[in-house]
Design a protein with these regions (language model features):
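Periplasmic polypeptide-binding modules associated with outer-membrane biogenesis and secretion
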Residues: 1-178
Length: 178
């Protein structure tokens, strides 16, 4: 049973003892992609890098879909698919195996409509724009935005913490203002 007991060496502390039952391990049996038209499922499987037979780990799955530097969502957002989303659904659980359906919405590619620079009082605007890897008329790219922020920070005129892009998507028009 779980317990909390006073620490024998330091009376201002307590020791917490917990019994944890992790449950059974589950394994990925199959991954089926739904809604993908831009990339073939073989390529998406390589990017996801979770294979049949791997131990199911929800945290790792979410990282591979959305958080890692080479995550699936980055693949799409770097090609203009700002409105992209993917929802992993457990469609079949049998014994210790899980079948997944990756339900994707690719959406249309977003074009940068405008880039507004606000709060700058130190540098001429054309100097700031010269450092940007994103320009109006280009496809949206998350990597290019991050690279632009790094370049602006390296100029030495701005606090990196204050360089925060305000991304305003317009799904109806397929554009984005930054």
């Amino acid at each position: 049973a779980d317990s909390i007991v006073p620490n024998a060496e330091d009376p201002t502390r307590v020791d917490v003892h917990m019994h944890i039952h992790e449950g059974e391990k589950y394994y990925v049996r199959d991954i089926h992609w739904v809604g993908n038209t831009v990339y073939p499922y073989e390529y998406l499987n390589r990017v996801l890098n979770i294979k049949k037979g791997d131990v199911y780990n929800l945290k790792e799955l979410n990282k591979r879909l959305n958080e890692d530097d080479d995550a699936l969502s980055k693949l799409y957002t770097d090609q203009g698919y700002l409105f992209f989303s993917v929802d992993p659904v457990e469609v079949n659980v049998e014994n210790d195996s899980i079948d997944f359906e990756m339900r994707m919405y690719e959406g249309r590619q977003a074009t940068i409509n405008s880039i507004n620079i606000k709060g700058n009082t130190r540098v001429y605007e054309h100097v700031v724009r010269r450092e940007l890897y994103t320009k109006p008329g280009q496809l949206y790219s998350q990597s290019d935005i991050m690279r632009s922020l790094r370049e602006l920070a390296q100029m030495g005129h701005f606090d990196q913490e204050n360089l925060v892009p305000d991304i305003q998507p317009n799904p109806e028009e397929g554009t984005v203002d930054i």
